[in-house]
Amino acid sequence: MALPVTSDNFDEEVLQSEVPVLVDFWAEWCGPCKMIGPLVDAVASDTEGSAKVGKVDVDSQQERARTFNIQSLPTIAFFKGGEVVETMIGTMGVTVDVLKEKLAALA
């Protein structure tokens, strides 16, 4: 299951991570977010130890969403070395295999 990421743990879990990190920026009211949620959770289970997978609820973490200029949901951001290196916006092309491949390429 993906790790809930908040202002309290974002720096430690994402920015200071020694492994690549996938962060799913989502909201409870977002239908497409609910569609990809199970895919993100599957990636979290499949990549445990080699990567981190987190979820940021943009409604409760508005400042964090602003920091990364999140304007559309869902947005998946890939972090390496504390920097965003790639983003995927929407559901087009989001599969477990694609997400795992993108994380593996960052390892």
Q: Where are the predicted features?
A:
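A short beta-strand-turn-helix
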Residues: 3-21, 62
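Conserved Rossmann-like nucleotide-binding pocket used by diverse enzymes
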Residues: 6, 26, 52-54
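Conserved helix-turn-beta segment immediately C-terminal to the redox Cys motif
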Residues: 18-20, 37-56
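Short pre-active-site segment immediately N-terminal to redox-active cysteine/selenocysteine motifs
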Residues: 18-19, 25-29, 72
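A short, hydrophobic beta-strand/beta-hairpin element that forms part of a small beta-sheet core
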Residues: 22, 40, 64, 74-88
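Conserved redox-active cysteine motifs that mediate thiol-disulfide chemistry
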Residues: 25-39
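Structural microenvironment flanking redox-active thiols in thiol-disulfide oxidoreductases
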Residues: 58-65
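Non-catalytic, surface beta->alpha helical segment in thiol-disulfide oxidoreductase systems
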Residues: 77-107
